[in-house]
């Protein structure tokens, strides 16, 4: 019995240190623009989604249009230009919950230079996700991809876990992407300098 408990503990520790494994896809249709979500979003002060004006580029974000989480303009990801940091998260992802205040801190200090965009990914608990947004104080724009449309959409890999970061340059190219659990704003600043060439 103790051996089984030890194995389970090791598996749980591995999950916490390496990210959260994705659950199976849920129902075919999940509404991310309901009156309740709109009210919660407004109360949280989440900024509106801003569609881009660019054309698709090689190595850029995929030609995938996602709805604005909690209502607002849909966004074709391929139209976006950086420098920008894109974060994929979900309410069921423990490490995502822990790092969201770090992302918000970065947003508050550097949004004019490097905007932050969050994507609630493969998350069927949309009310719980918006509650998490309220709890963590997130205000940067949020899209939703409850059916994991981005999974394998070039240049994204087959998603195995969260949290996930992508760095987009001024030409709209994804210059770097990785599964990473942020522990400090400085860690994110270092990644921005390394991959986007910006020292903030």
Predicted segments, located by residue:
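N-terminal targeting signals for export/organelle localization
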Residues: 1-67, 200
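A short beta-strand-turn-helix
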Residues: 56-58, 63-84
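Short active-site neighborhood of thiol/selenol oxidoreductases, capturing the structured segment around
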Residues: 74-97, 103, 116
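A generic structural signal for alpha->beta connector loops
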Residues: 82, 113-114, 139-140
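Structural microenvironment flanking redox-active thiols in thiol-disulfide oxidoreductases
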Residues: 97-136, 146-153
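Thiol/disulfide oxidoreductase modules built on the thioredoxin-like
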Residues: 134-138, 145-200
């Amino acid at each position: 019995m103790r051996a089984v408990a030890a194995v389970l503990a090791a598996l749980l520790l591995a999950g916490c240190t390496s990210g959260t494994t994705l659950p199976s896809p849920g129902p075919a249709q999940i509404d991310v623009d309901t009156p309740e979500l709109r009210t919660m979003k407004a109360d949280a002060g989440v900024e509106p989604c801003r569609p881009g004006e660019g054309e698709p580029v090689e190595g850029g974000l995929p030609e995938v249009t996602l709805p604005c989480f909690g209502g607002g303009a849909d966004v074709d990801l391929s139209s976006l230009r950086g420098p920008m940091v894109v974060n994929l998260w979900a309410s069921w992802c423990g490490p995502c919950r822990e790092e969201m205040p770090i992302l918000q801190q970065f947003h508050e200090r550097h949004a004019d230079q490097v905007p932050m965009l969050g994507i609630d990914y493969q998350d069927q608990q949309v009310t719980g996700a918006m509650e998490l947004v309220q709890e963590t104080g997130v205000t940067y724009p949020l899209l939703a991809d409850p059916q994991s449309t981005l999974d394998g959409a070039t240049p994204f890999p087959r998603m195995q876990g969260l949290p996930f970061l992508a760095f987009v340059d001024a030409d709209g190219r994804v210059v770097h992407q990785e599964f990473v659990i942020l522990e400090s704003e400085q860690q994110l600043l270092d990644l921005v300098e390394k991959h986007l060439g910006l020292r903030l």
